[in-house]
Structure formats: structure tokens, C-alpha cells
Amino acid sequence: MDIKPITDPEVTDFMDSFYRPLSPVLQEIRVEAEADRIPVLRRETETFLRTLLTLQRPRSILEIGAAVGYSASLFATVCPDAHVTTIESDAYMASCARNNTVRACVSDRIEIIEGDARETASLIEGIFDFAFIDASKSHYREFWDAVVG
């Protein structure tokens, strides 16, 4: 079975041509994660999300799947008035995320919850203006159900 990309490679290349790191620290976190083969946002996805967040200006963001905290740090940087809540099931990754949010100087606006999002997401109180699910793809529907109730 031949798996084709979601977007045309020419479109991806075009979008990548607009990519610029948001800060030197975020660039360092990206490079380190990529070197360690830890998945972070693709550059074209980051460009799209930065545009979307700039237009929407959410004040509360939920992320499922923190990994090293790159996306959460990016979201907090793009949206300086927002509070980001992120859920990570892996203790080591949650620790890395905590360290990286400190490095990015956004830890005061990011809450990292350690646990399985299928269990913890429904326990979080409040309404989120923006939700980003970036965890185990096979559980996306369960994460969605936990988030929207």
C-alpha cells in the first residue's frame, strides 16, 4: 500500500519557505527534539498554527500530548495573554516539557498535567478557546470525546 502525504509536496515546500523560528530558544528545543527523534510540529503545521493563533487570540489553550513542551511553549509565546494546559502521559517527557517551558520563559503560563488524557481531560474545569490534540493517533477519537464531553 502506497501512503501519500496529506498535502502536495509543492504546497509543503511553499509553506516551509515562510517558516522562521519564533525565538532562538524555541529553535534550540526543536533542533534537540529532532536530533533525539522526538516528534515536534512540522514546520508547515507550525506556520499554519501560528497564523491561526494570531488571528484567533485564544486566552485558554488545551494541548493533549506535550512531548518536550515545544508546542505549548510556542502557543504561550504566540499568545502572550493565554494560559496553556497540556497533558502528557509519559513522566520523562513531562519533565522535559517542564524544563523547556522554563527555558522558553513561559512556564508561568503553562500547566503540565501528567497522566492519560482519556482520564484526565474530563477532570479539567473550564472552557478552552483552542484545543490541539497531538498524541497517540489511534486514540484521537477518545481524546476528542474526553475534551468535548
List each language-model region with its residue ranges.
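A short alpha-helical cap/connector motif
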Residues: 1-130, 137-149
